[in-house]
Design a protein with these regions (language model features):
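Non-catalytic accessory regions used for complex assembly or targeting
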Residues: 1-81, 87, 91-93, 101-120, ...
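"Short basic amphipathic alpha-helical interaction patches in structured regions
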Residues: 100-107, 158-164
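Aromatic/basic-lined ligand-recognition segments
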Residues: 125-163
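Compact mixed alphabeta submodule
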Residues: 151-192
Length: 242
């Protein structure tokens, strides 16, 4: 495996071979997520226990990202019982940009990962994003991805600092917590009630659970700062084998 920058809490704060902005943005992220009333109890607890993993993306160099993601997936296999998340911090813009800019950037990162993926797309995952069972995959693993950005003003739970922060959660961490199971439905309901209180907005209409036949997974990857349905086609394109 080539160069990889898979970091834990300590690495994000003190590594001397990474850009200076990384520690600052990790501090911003931590200040939000460690707020006692932060809606995602999973994220808060995992951060405290040093179970989350992170990396960074410089504006002009994405080359380490595929290997870093593979390192994370390998870590998941070592201790599958730990419900880890992976958060990618993108170098902040010199001036804050509109939400659509960050959404476009988000999809470019996912597309880049897909283009660099040398492993076979999972057989059980459709290749058409308009299929209700489609979801992003990398390294042979289905993964839930979601964007957070400084342009979110209403949805404060999605504003984690000056960086675009992309969260990646392998589908395996949701085993036993699926939305159509009592435990999963209860957990989601509790989190969504807390999110509603933080954001002072109702649940976004594109938020649902994986497997809902009326749901399109890609639409909840980067929701709006509002309660408007996301329209149009998915920006993601499955690569064509030559």
């Amino acid at each position: 495996m080539g160069e990889s920058y898979l970091l834990d809490n300590e690495g994000m704060k003190n590594r001397d071979d990474i850009p200076n902005w990384v520690a600052k943005e990790f501090n911003n992220f931590s200040n939000v997520v460690l707020e006692p009333t932060f809606p995602c109890y999973f994220g808060l607890t995992a951060l405290k226990k040093n179970e989350l993993r992170y990396s960074f993306l410089s504006r002009n160099d994405w080359s380490h990202l595929p290997n870093t993601m593979l390192s994370f997936l390998e870590l998941m296999k070592e201790r599958p019982i730990v419900r880890r998340g992976f958060f990618l911090f993108v170098e902040p813009e010199r001036e804050e940009q509109p939400l659509e800019y960050y959404r476009d950037y988000f999809w470019k990162v996912l597309q880049y990962l897909h283009e660099k993926d040398n492993q076979t797309w999972p057989k059980q995952i459709p290749k058409d994003p308009d299929h209700y069972l489609w979801e992003f995959s990398f390294g042979g693993e289905p993964i839930f991805a979601f964007g957070n950005a400084p342009a979110y003003k209403q949805r404060k739970t999605r504003h984690l600092g000056n960086s675009l922060v992309i969260g990646f959660q392998p589908r395996t961490i949701f085993d036993g917590l699926e939305g159509d199971r009592p435990k999963g439905a209860y957990s989601r309901q509790m989190v969504r009630e807390r999110v509603k209180k933080w954001d002072q907005l109702p649940k976004h209409p594109n938020i649902s659970h994986y497997g809902d036949i009326d749901h399109r997974e890609w639409k909840q990857y980067f929701i709006g700062d509002d309660i408007e349905l996301i329209k149009g086609k998915c920006p993601f394109h499955h690569k064509v084998k030559l």
